[in-house]
């Protein structure tokens, strides 16, 4: 829950001086990106902006405290303030902030600006007490905010110092409205107005001016002088002389003498006790001070001018002026030291009663009450964990003695999940092992089962599927049906283990079960994970269309639950890119890979390795080797500076080896082959992929026999495990092996198998990257006119893709080629005496490449009837009667010119 008072603009008080000259300057705030109000404490920053904000509707107010250095807390309140200003316009951002479903503050702000693009009225966001922010991540995020905020939004920041928000740049670009302490200082006229409304007996203008000069227009000093004068301790001028030259850090003695010592003991204790509250209402005051009618007491303190201010229009919430509040808290530690723990306990109990466990934890920590802290955590820790209050939980658990954790194993489990969320896998197992060894009376087997579910998740994350399987099975055997979270975890882990072992059908069933349970209990990140795993399994089985449909369900879940900022979103767009690439939808595949990189923009560059490999695959499929080389340099740098799962390494190696094949770089392939890992098994798609990389390198080096052994074993495993997509890839590589080894009939046999299997997988680009060797074989198959209709159509489509992206390898009938051909001593006399036109040579090249008449017309952007005329003319000039004869004639010409076809 968010504390309402932190989102309420302070109420404009009746006896404050209206700062007309400053309000006039602020009237043009909408022309600036940032309005910055800076001064030491007590110069009236908040009062001024509350006056300016009066009557404005499109304004959000966020009052900071020290706890707002937690990024998640800062995000929640800031988005809530924007929602307040826009009447709930940014619903997606609000949900993302509430559920902590964003990768970083900057990515959350980017989504906010997308939603605000539809908001066209002027909009203001006030952030008060920004000097309390010390978290550099928040500073950087707010710099991003200011750089990219909509033109109709003005950010108003109040701070005691110059914040780290890129102020100099804004000032140069005239996008900054500044008001500092010199402008905030009261003028003689304002000081006179102030005393006139505060004192029963007015003072002369000259006296008022001297007092104002003595304290340099400091508003807090003027307020203290008025308070002293009302209490008749001594003259206003005497107070002014005493305050002259005193700054906020030296006020303690003065405040003791002039404020605390001039109120009765009951009021003194009320002030000291209530000051421990960062914000307060009737219930909190009654519980903390022990006085009845807390609201009336607060209003009485307000009337006495004791630096208390209302925080909302209803008058329910109050807080002390920061300067006075800090002073009172220090005095409370000195004067009520013995009572202070009990006061904090009372505050914690009252916050709990009002449903604010995070505030209660703050006071339980201050009280040093481990038992109270334990009880709060037992009741609310998992809710705080699910809302990503990780820093607060970690601080709280550290404050508990180890014996208290042992007596409450749920808290040990919580601490372990905190470690797991921070990828401290080794510490998780150490903590759980120590706890199980020392816990004397653990409840039945349930807690052991929860420990094992977490251990299983750690094991699979750490690349140990056998241990993960053992632990997940133990957990599922012992967990009661109602312990849904750990059951979801264990079921998901077991499904992932089976996926790794190639038991795809069983894995798919478990992932579907995980999805169902996760949806039932609103555990959305596991629901998304299970859908991604289902898609990968279906892809491996060769059911790419069903994999696509499963991905669509995952995208829908992301949109419905606003999960766009989760790192898992990158996983989804990456496997979508892989599927699009397989279907030769290269522009869409590249766009998906780039969106994956964008999702991970706030993470370490190593996390982008997989998407970068996908971009390289797109370049390779297009035949764009220059771009591929540039991207490979970055990929190889990332490989050398990180530790990766075998799946990641396999995908990175794949694009490297294909690039070496396309460029004929045998030295690089040989060096890689000497050092690369050779997996013990090949029972899943990433192990199959690594062995396929090895076989491709061996083929490039002419090591046909060991490559054939590898590929035959891969095919045997793929067939037995129904890894149909891997089988399709293996057949294509085996085809290249046979072709280069001169075993043409074997090459044709496996190519026919690959084409048939592609009717299921839909593969196109896997054929295309094999380039000219593949094109030659497909042309021959098309010429034989024996392919079934589906295979014939696919072969023609593959040839079109090769022609589009690799034309330099085989479309040889350009002007230079024709000139050399006509000057060749062995050129047929018929061609020499009746030469083809340049257009007819182009048509012959496209016929040779396997294009139909309609496709040739589309390629050359002419009418189909025009193409028929060109074909009729070139047939006559070549002395051929049909297409197959024209292809054979073109083949003879290419051989004569030294092209291997």
Curated annotation (Swiss-Prot):
ATP binds at residues 39-46. It comes from the Bacteria. Activated by ATP and maltotriose, which are both required for DNA binding. GO terms for molecular function: ATP binding; DNA binding; DNA-binding transcription factor activity. Pfam families: GerE (PF00196), TPR_MalT (PF17874). The keyword DNA-binding applies. Residues 829-894 form the HTH luxR-type domain. Keywords: Activator, ATP-binding, Carbohydrate metabolism, DNA-binding, Nucleotide-binding, Transcription, Transcription regulation. Residues 853-872 bind DNA. CDD domains: LuxR_C_like. GO terms for biological process: positive regulation of carbohydrate metabolic process; positive regulation of DNA-templated transcription. Positively regulates the transcription of the maltose regulon whose gene products are responsible for uptake and catabolism of malto-oligosaccharides. Specifically binds to the promoter region of its target genes, recognizing a short DNA motif called the MalT box. HAMAP family: HTH_type_MalT. Belongs to the MalT family. Monomer in solution. Oligomerizes to an active state in the presence of the positive effectors ATP and maltotriose. NCBIfam families: PRK04841.1 (NF003420). This is HTH-type transcriptional regulator MalT.
